[in-house]
């Protein structure tokens, strides 16, 4: 992602903020066409660029900083979504993600979003996705934007599926139930 930033900004120079904190997201100030710009970019080389509690906080603070000083925002997306699991849920991933969501939604500066490779689920949404109505949103021709990650079935789930008994189709169920009813002996009325 740093190579992309280097090619976009004037003289290939930028000022990174909080480089040692929440490494799955990059927040930096740079110049593009001589004008100051704030860049929020996912870092796919760190945990695939997934958003967690710290990265959501880092991005929210940076967006608020840029908005306070009237610095336009550029979002570079290569994000698989938010971290999931009991540990992050107990640490408040919803609360931290909401901070980022609120910061991006209330920012009044111009916003541009570029989807470079992948943008899935809530990660796409909070990184200034279409719902925020950015001033410009573009995607690389091979980029994937989706609610869920598209995955091939794993071999273990395929093997499990082959061992399970096949569930009959609705048409098969109704015919088998009808034949079961006709072969069941009936008792005279009033008896068990």
Q: What is the predicted role of each segment?
A:
Residues 1-192:
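Ligand-binding clefts of soluble mixed alpha/beta catalytic domains
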């Amino acid at each position: 992602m740093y190579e992309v930033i280097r090619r976009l900004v004037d003289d290939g120079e930028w000022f990174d903020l909080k480089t040692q904190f929440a490494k799955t997201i990059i927040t930096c100030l740079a110049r593009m066409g001589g004008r100051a710009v704030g860049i929020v970019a996912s870092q796919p080389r760190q945990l695939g660029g997934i958003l967690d509690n710290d990265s959501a906080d880092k991005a929210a603070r940076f967006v608020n900083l840029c908005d306070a000083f009237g610095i336009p925002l550029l979002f570079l997306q290569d994000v698989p979504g938010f971290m999931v699991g009991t540990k992050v849920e107990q640490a408040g991933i919803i609360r931290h993600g909401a901070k980022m969501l609120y910061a991006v939604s209330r920012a009044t500066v111009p916003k541009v979003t570029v989807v470079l490779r992948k943008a899935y689920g809530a990660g796409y949404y909070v990184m200034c996705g279409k719902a925020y109505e950015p001033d410009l949103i573009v995607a690389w021709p091979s980029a994937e934007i989706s609610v869920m990650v598209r995955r091939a079935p794993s071999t273990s789930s395929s093997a499990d599926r082959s061992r399970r008994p096949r569930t009959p189709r609705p048409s098969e169920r109704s015919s088998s139930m009808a034949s079961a009813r006709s072969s069941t002996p009936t008792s005279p009325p009033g008896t068990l």
